[in-house]
Amino acid sequence: MAQQSMKVRPVLLKRSSLESVELVKQPHHRRSKSQQVRFKEDGNIKNPTGVTEVNTQTPEDPGVMGKAQASRHHHPTTYSLSFPRSHKAGGFRSISIQTSPSLRKHFPVFKRKKLTTSKSLVEMPTASPSAIQVNGNLSEQDIVSSDLAFLRLAQHLEDGPRRLKIPHPFLPRMPKVQSNGPVSFCLESGTWMSSEKATAAIQVPDDICHSPTWEARESALSPESSAEESNSIPALISMCPGDGQRVMTSELERMPPCSNTNSSASNMPGTEKLTPELLLPKDNPDDKDLGLPSSQSKKMCVPSPPRTHSSPEPGSRSQPVHLGRSSDCPASGDNHQDLESLRSSSASKSVPVCWEHVTKLPSQSDTPELQTGVGSEQLPASIPRQENRAQSSREIGGSNHSHLAQGELCDLQGRLQSVEESLHSNQEKIKVLLNVIQDLEKAHALTEGRNFYRTGQDLNNCSTCQNTACIIYSVEYDFRQQEGRFHEVLQSLEEAEPTEEAPSPPKSPAEAPVPEKQDLRRKSKKVKKKCFWWI
């Protein structure tokens, strides 16, 4: 099977690379050969990274992706060694890590793109009249959230890495969405510059797209969300000039819960109600009406690279709100400059803050402080809980400290038992060895015609005594050594006994085997006297 796939694969690779127009050059064939060796054991036809773009693209625009691939070769400096994005090629998942250096150079630098907006975003062409210009001051969170908002229109979500193409009235091509690994926003550089199609690769964590609640919300809410989006986006696009379009659409897609209650997408003062209390079930009586929009906003607010997204349970309506966005939303009005400042402030929040407030939202929904605002009241509400936890931890620490002495005693008793067992086993070994020596001696005496024998009597003539005495001495030496360790343990126990008077009752059974040990030593001494009487 592997050999057949090896024979079939180069033909398919050449065909697909020819479909991507003559701009795809010879290096693609070299890379496909190296990758053919790499994926030989899979038995499934997997395309190399350079060709998967062509296969996942619709057959009507292979030339555009060919330009994109050609433009990659002109920007070798923007790539560094990083983990490859696994593409959905032919329905199969490539599971092996690409270690060849010629395959690694496609993948962009993530660190630089987290800090500043990438060149490819700023240099996006305005050739098509409906193309959206991106302001250089925008954070990548805006682009991620606005692009991910269209994910809810896709009803053919599958498990594993996926690339979706969804049409949109303002974009000629919907950005491709790929879910694998951590949330990171990476743009194939040169694609925006060389083509009119906006193709971005957004990596979404697996727990978002794979969780049943995500897919349930996806299937249940896609008709409503599509209708709402068709109403909302044109209204705000008409409000804002060129560079502000992206800002307002992304902002609107975060705010449909409150604007939906007024049944008007352009009613922006309704956003002054968008505080996390709307999304908590016990604070707002109107939440029954807002249930679907709140869960819908869960879908749209997919965090940017520095954040993590918790897939909430269906029962809890609490949205994983970014703290900056939730606390700043009441101040947002009609002007998009405030919204830009909100984006920059919310983008600066770190992961622990987000997680802290996500975990606190459902648990503290009963406290009245939340109704005045999350940013100012949540931390004081959490202070008494932390004090209670600290007190309980102190009590547990005290009880652990009291139990510590008993634990050490149990440990010492266990060591004592192990030493006793080793002593018993060594004594049995000595007895067995002595019996073996006596049997050998008896056999020697009978063969030599002697009717008498004493163990170790004939050291000069008896080869058995000469060969086995060292064994007996070595066993005896080990026995003495372990006996010395046993006495050390006993002394440590006796020293610990006057200092700790409380654990003295459980100590008494541990002292019981001591006379037995003395009896055993007496017996072993008698045996030694019998065996080594000449010493």
Swiss-Prot record:
UniProt feature coiled coil, ranges: 411-448
- The signal peptide stretch is none
Give the span(s) annotated as Disordered: 23-85, 215-346, 360-387, 493-528
Record flagged with keyword Secreted: no
Q: Where is the composition biased (Low complexity)?
A: 219-232
Assigned keywords, A-Z: Coiled coil
Skewed-composition ranges (Polar residues): 46-59, 258-269, 307-319, 361-375
The UniProt entry, under InterPro entries, shows: INSYN2
Q: Which Pfam families match?
A: FAM196
Q: What is the similarity comment for this entry?
A: Belongs to the INSYN2 family.
Q: What is this protein called?
A: INSYN2B protein
